[in-house]
Amino acid sequence: PFGHSGERAISTFFSEGKGLRLKEIQPDGEQLSTMEWEDLTHFEGNANGFAVLTATRPGNEGGLRMSYATLGAFMKYPKESLPKKPTAAIADKKYGFFQTDKAFFQDVASDMGMIPNKSGNDIGFERHPLAYLVEAADDNCYTISDFEDGINLGLVSEDFALEYLIKLVKDSIDTSKYKTLETKEDRISYLRALAIGSLINDAVKVFVENEGAILNGKFPYSLMDMSKYKVQM
């Protein structure tokens, strides 16, 4: 819920601000572990999302009580905060749970049959297959919607938008319909819907073509990394 700016603000509070004192002072006299301190000084929204979804509160046992399959699909980065980016694989780009949620995270991953990919005491797994689709949906919609906002705010010209989006919509655009749309907002909304549709179809194609590798934990890319529209994204 904090966005990337919020992540940086929280991280800076603990690494440079008043939160720095918590590294040494704990109510029970114990110091935070290296991993716990990393969770605070490199705060990660994906890990916080997992905590929000699963946190037990008075009268609310198990948080939102989502199915393990839903939580598995949510877990884009199924590893702890350290080591940082141990490989170039997309699943190792960030981390997906705080130390306080480690036991439950491992329980979900184990129950879903997610493939362990770390050695020693490090905790990490290959992605749940559906996490690739969740990531693609997130990337596709936000990228195009942010672009649409830029156009509607006058930061991007309509002509440039059409030039940018044409490779995404050229196979599906109805030019006669497009010409009947009277306002810029309607025209851009039409292009946005077509563009997202093209990206969805391509993501599905990449997923199906690589399903075997994905199921076996051998697909270290995002779906959009392999998309024919990667340049546009």
Feature map (PLM): residue ranges:
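Sequence-structural signature of the catalytic-core scaffold of metal-dependent phosphohydrolases
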Residues: 2-191, 200
